[in-house]
């Protein structure tokens, strides 16, 4: 659902991509994790009817590892993290001197900015904490905007370092 939800739609008796001109990116290891052998905890998040049409349409690019310049014309690179789920991609876009990071389920809401505040769905919570700490520190140092997909009030935030750790700069 939210890992790929909205990317496909039913058209008659087929499920097809909603955006026929879009390009989709996924790490090979995450694709295998989601399609070949999803674990019982995550199986409901990786609905094959949402995933396979993207591959079948030829719109999906699978890649290995963190990638700089996955889509250079958009200034896009992808950071891979392993705490929430195996090789989850965090898209990072540089445009007109600004950088924005799609925090995905690593930092889904403003309430999840403090490092110990995690999602209950994380498959490796201690790894999530390490990854989140490193990525948030880097975001502060590089003045990166953070886009949070699940926060209805704070879609894009600026972060700052405080005595309690990284927090919102409000």
Which residues does each PLM region occupy?
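Metallo-beta-lactamase
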Residues: 1-2, 9-11, 15-80, 130-143
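Cap/insert and terminal regions of metallo-dependent hydrolase folds
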Residues: 5, 13, 88, 96-170
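A broadly conserved detector of short glycine/acidic/proline-rich loop/turn motifs that flank catalytic sites
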Residues: 30, 66, 82, 95, ...
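Short, well-ordered secondary-structure micro-motifs
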Residues: 35-38, 73, 91, 113-114, ...
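Active-site-proximal beta-strand elements of phosphoester/diester hydrolases
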Residues: 76-82, 100-105
């Amino acid at each position: 659902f939210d890992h790929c939800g909205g990317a496909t739609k039913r058209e008659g008796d087929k499920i097809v991509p909603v955006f026929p001109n879009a390009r989709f990116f996924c790490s090979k290891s995450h694709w295998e994790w989601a399609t070949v052998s999803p674990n019982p905890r995550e199986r409901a998040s990786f609905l094959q009817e949402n995933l396979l049409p993207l591959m079948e349409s030829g719109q999906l690019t699978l890649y290995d590892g963190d990638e700089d310049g996955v889509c250079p014309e958009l200034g896009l690179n992808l950071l891979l993290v392993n705490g929430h789920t195996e090789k989850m991609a965090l898209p990072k876009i540089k445009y007109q001197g600004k950088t924005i990071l799609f925090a995905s389920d690593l930092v889904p809401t403003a309430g999840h900015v403090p490092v110990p505040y995690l999602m209950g769905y994380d498959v490796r919570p201690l790894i999530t904490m390490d990854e989140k700490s490193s990525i948030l520190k880097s975001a502060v140092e590089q003045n990166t905007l953070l886009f949070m997909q699940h926060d209805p009030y704070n879609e894009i935030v600026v972060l700052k370092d405080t005595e309690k750790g990284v927090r919102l700069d409000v």
